[in-house]
């Protein structure tokens, strides 16, 4: 009893809500075997024939290729495409493809050479000896994608399933009217399909493998049952004919009773589905080592004289296939790629066959009926009753027409499979599927823009965070660099500050000198001697090289002599015209001694310096200029008055002069004498004699004012003190 119940549950099938029963129209093409089509002279292979990004080109214009040679590299979801025949690549350029708007996509254009030579093929007849990862990689690199219409890369789908797949479903329903590609493939290649199913089961290791096929394919059912007679790991389930039973979510519910959640995938409930055409392509890729270069395409419709199913090479122009089938176009002929419910009309016939092309329908005008005008929605809810996804098409229609994207998303417009059942039953002839496709495209564009904006914002915030981190790191480095001075440095700073304060305090104290006593300058003298000793030590440690002294120019000497004579004449004239001032003989003697010392020094310097050559013309010019200046000074000197002289100041200056004279004589005796320029000495001597004559004349001509004896005595005493102090200082300096 339990065994009978288990057997009953094993063959149990479920149903889904909605669905329609349109005319099947399959008998036009499923009665003839598969046949080959002659090679087209030119093939157009789009780089993107699947869901995902296009692969990277690995050929260039002018390359010769063989059938099965990879034209692109596949990484990740980038599925490679292969050459459908041998020939030459003549162009790599955009070309219109299988799209409702015939959008241009980058394509490789090949001129066939007619030889149809294959690449070297290496099949894995013992595929069980290879790992799961190696099999998946081979399937991916051989370009196998979902041939049921989605075009999802099979290798990526198998890799994503992982170990959570418990049920493998093979979709053999083929529910849309007119299409018989899978039906004919199962009738002619049932054994190869089953072998491909076993390879998929070996990769996924599911608990059960189910084949779902509609009951309107009796020949295909009988062929599969014959092949599966001895197979107990694969179950064939025959389901009632209802459109769209071939949808992934609908067939999953029919065979397992499980519903795929909104926004989810069948793998979320442990189910993975593959098409029978995909299973056949897997077998050829793994066992035979042949990449996917062709597929079965249904050519049907009353405008075709020889309908049937053919092996069409990928990249073959649609026009070439239709002409081979006896296409008889009318004035307003349309050609549909796909079925009448989910397909789209081609704008022209130069588009190529791709991996998702399963049917080319060329109906007559009477077959499709006259186009009817779109009317307003009457809210009859017939579309909601027919929807297999349990949606509300009338609400989605209003949201799509009113650009209310948020409400359309909230009503699960993404779950629409675009089966066309709602448009089929609509009494107002509203093309609901077109509205839904447009709305989903707009929502996808908005989401893509939001994603880009979010990525840009994330990059901006990351940059700002990085800049803040760098700024904080810089501030931390600056704070660590600003180290407080060590204890010994602080002690040195404190000692320096104490010395400065002590000096300031000493400077502010008043200096008191008692009457009749000399000031005590011993501390100042000691400090000065210490500084002088330090300076002499530095000079001894770092001797400086005397710079070479250029010789005197005779022209300059002549000019200076002329100036000296002019000054002498001026002083003589002043002495003759002005009253003479009294002259101090001591001061005159001091000045004479100073003049003699300077003369000796200049003579020594003149003896060691070479003389430069003198131009006589320039010397004469300069002498004339000097005489002119002297005459001008003589004229100015005649008009200037003389100032009176104070005898007390004269006495003080005489005492200071005597002290300086003694000091200079002592220095001259102890220090090496410097060379003296005789010309400068002569000039200075002349000036000194002129000054002496002037003072003598002033002394004779000017009356002497009577002086106060007390003030004179005080001045003389101060002069003697200063002279003694100067003499002591001189002795100290010599020591």
From Swiss-Prot:
| E.C. number(s) listed in UniProt | 7.-.-.-
Membrane-topology annotation of the record: Peripheral membrane protein
The UniProt record gives the binding positions of [4Fe-4S] cluster 1 as 377, 380, 383, 426
Domain 4Fe-4S ferredoxin-type, residue spans: 368-397, 407-436
Can you cite a GO biological process for this protein? electron transport chain
Subunit note: The complex is composed of six subunits: RsxA, RsxB, RsxC, RsxD, RsxE and RsxG.
The record's function comment reads: Part of a membrane-bound complex that couples electron transfer with translocation of ions across the membrane. Required to maintain the reduced state of SoxR.
Protein known as = Ion-translocating oxidoreductase complex subunit C
Q: Which taxonomic lineage does the organism of this UniProt entry have?
A: Bacteria, Pseudomonadati, Pseudomonadota, Gammaproteobacteria, Enterobacterales
Q: Which gene encodes it?
A: rsxC
């Amino acid at each position: 009893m339990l065994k009978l119940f288990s057997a009953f549950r094993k063959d149990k099938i479920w149903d889904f809500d909605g669905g329609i029963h349109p005319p099947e129209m399959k008998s036009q093409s499923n009665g003839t075997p598969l046949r080959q089509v002659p090679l087209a002279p030119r093939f157009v292979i789009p780089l993107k024939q699947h869901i995902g990004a296009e692969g990277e080109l690995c050929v260039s214009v002018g390359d010769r290729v063989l059938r099965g040679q990879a034209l692109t590299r596949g990484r990740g979801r980038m599925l490679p495409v292969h050459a459908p025949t041998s020939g030459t690549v003549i162009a790599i350029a955009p070309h219109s493809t299988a799209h409702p708007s015939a959008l241009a996509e980058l394509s490789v254009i090949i001129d066939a050479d007619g030889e149809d030579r294959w690449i070297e093929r290496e099949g894995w007849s013992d595929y069980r000896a290879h790992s799961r990862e190696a099999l998946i990689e081979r399937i991916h690199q051989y370009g196998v994608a979902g041939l049921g219409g989605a075009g999802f890369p099979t290798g990526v789908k198998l890799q994503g399933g992982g170990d959570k797949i418990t049920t493998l479903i093979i979709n053999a329903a083929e529910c849309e009217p007119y299409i018989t590609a899978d039906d004919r493939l199962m009738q002619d290649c049932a054994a190869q399909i089953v072998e491909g199913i076993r390879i998929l089961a070996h990769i996924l290791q599911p608990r059960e493998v189910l084949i779902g096929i509609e009951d309107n394919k009796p020949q295909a059912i009988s062929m599969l049952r014959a092949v599966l007679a001895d197979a107990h790991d694969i179950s064939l389930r025959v389901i009632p004919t209802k459109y769209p039973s071939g949808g992934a979510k609908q067939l999953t519910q029919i065979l397992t009773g499980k519903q795929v959640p909104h926004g989810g995938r069948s793998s979320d409930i442990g189910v993975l589905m593959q098409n029978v055409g995909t299973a056949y392509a897997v077998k050829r890729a793994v066992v035979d080592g042949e990449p996917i270069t062709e597929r079965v395409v249904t050519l049907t419709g009353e405008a075709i004289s020889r309908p049937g199913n053919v092996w069409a090479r990928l990249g073959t122009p649609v026009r070439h296939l239709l002409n081979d089938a006896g296409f008889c176009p009318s004035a307003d002929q349309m050609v549909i790629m796909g079925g009448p419910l989910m397909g789209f009309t081609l704008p022209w016939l130069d588009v190529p066959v791709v991996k998702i092309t399963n049917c080319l329908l060329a109906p007559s005008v009477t077959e499709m009926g006259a186009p009817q005008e779109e009317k307003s929605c009457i809210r009859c809810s017939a579309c909601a009753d027919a929807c297999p996804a349990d949606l509300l098409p009338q609400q989605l229609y209003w949201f799509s027409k009113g650009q209310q994207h948020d409400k359309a998303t909230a009503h699960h417009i993404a779950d629409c499979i675009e089966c066309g059942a709602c448009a089929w039953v609509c009494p107002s002839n509203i093309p609901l599927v077109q509205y839904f496709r447009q709305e989903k495209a707009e929502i996808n564009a908005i989401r893509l823009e939001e994603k880009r904006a979010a990525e840009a914002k994330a990059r901006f915030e990351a940059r700002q965070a990085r800049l803040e981190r760098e700024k904080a790191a810089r501030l931390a480095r600056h704070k660590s660099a600003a180290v407080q001075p060590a204890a010994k440095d602080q002690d040195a700073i404190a000692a320096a500050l104490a010395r400065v304060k002590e000096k300031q305090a000493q400077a502010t104290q008043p200096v008191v000198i008692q009457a009749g006593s000399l000031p005590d300058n011993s501390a100042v003298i000691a400090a000065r001697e210490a500084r002088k000793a330090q300076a002499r030590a530095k000079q001894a440690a770092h001797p400086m090289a005397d710079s070479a002294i250029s010789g005197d120019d005779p022209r300059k000497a002549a000019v200076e002599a002329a100036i000296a004579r002019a000054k002498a004449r001026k002083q003589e004239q002043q002495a003759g015209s002005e009253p003479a001032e009294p002259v101090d003989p001591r001061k005159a003697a001091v000045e004479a001694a100073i003049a003699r010392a300077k003369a000796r020094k200049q003579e020594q310097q003149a003896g060691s310096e070479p003389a430069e050559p003198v131009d006589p013309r320039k010397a004469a010019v300069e002498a004339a200029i000097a005489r002119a200046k002297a005459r001008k000074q003589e004229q100015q000197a005649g008009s200037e008055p003389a100032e009176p002289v104070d005898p007390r100041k004269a006495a003080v200056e005489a005492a200071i002069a005597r002290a300086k004279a003694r000091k200079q004589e002592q220095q001259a005796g102890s220090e090496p004498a410097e060379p003296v320029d005789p010309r400068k000495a002569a000039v200075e001597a002349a000036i000194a004699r002129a000054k002496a004559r002037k003072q003598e004349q002033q002394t004779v001509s000017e009356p002497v004012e009577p002086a106060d004896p007390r003030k004179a005595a005080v001045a003389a005493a101060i002069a003697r003190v200063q002279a003694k102090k100067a003499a002591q200082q001189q002795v100290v300096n010599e020591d």
